[in-house]
Amino acid sequence: MPKIGNIELPDFPLLLAPMEDVSDPPFRKLCKEQGADVVYTEFISSEGLIRDAAKSVIKLDIYEKERPVGIQIFGAELDSMLQAVDIVEKSNPDIIDINFGCPVKKVVCKNAGAGILRDIPLMVKLTEEIVKRTKLPVTVKTRLGWDNNSIKIVEVAERLQDVGIQAISIHGRTRVQMYKGEADWKPIAEVKNNQRMHIPVFGNGDVDTPEAAVKMRDEFGLDGAMIGRASIGYPWFFNEVKYYFKTGEHLAPPSMQERVDAARRHLQMAIDWKGEKLGVFETRRHYTNYFKGIPHFKEYRMKMVTSDDAADVFDAFDEVEEKFGDFQFA
């Protein structure tokens, strides 16, 4: 079974990917309840932590019941990253993860995230110094390379392992691809098959069905899957994959009652965490998937995603429960 440092994981663990404005404490808690083995925070700016920016600091919050949990940081300045590690440690996470994969322009233009894939020596140096700075296990999330002409992920993964990381998660696209086209898992399998590699190698990108997870495990031989977009508004995905692993059959989708209950809990936890205004705003992105597949649903969805008043959103949940309570999801 794979391990991250001293953290023992089940065979082929399922990890919740760090996603900006998605993988916050309320959502992580729901995913953990539904079978996620490891969860990661949203990515956190090292510069923001040093400035004590409220938007960055609040992302350090952890629920005890979501462990093991990793806090992910990004940046390209060594001093800032090391200071950020010191701040992160005070929140007592189980793992520190370094983001070398975010393709967003505002991150890349600062040579952070996937931008650092243009400077592998700096990538390795930052990682080495962070590993030295902390007693926590350090992991890395990255991409295949900057573009198709610079894919050196086998070499990069080996060098990162050599400076002490405890696991690596690789998204099967380059930075130039962003999220377009299909994820290519073959280079990730090459990393895993490198005889020098002994740390867990997790695959990421297009793991959007139980069958895809089985393929990643059985055909590509990876150690686990990091789940991102497939989980947004659908925390049940983790248990569905695990059920498919055990039985070869699909778990019945959650009922309308289960979806409404989860949406209510999600919103209430978000309000308790960040207050009504932000709680209402930041849960909006989940509702489309919570209730995906219901015909003639636009009126209710619009109410959920446009109202600034929590009471109105809760009322919308009640209306959905009453009107569509007997709807059977395929």
What are these regions (language model features)?
Residues 1-330:
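Flavin-dependent oxidoreductase catalytic cores
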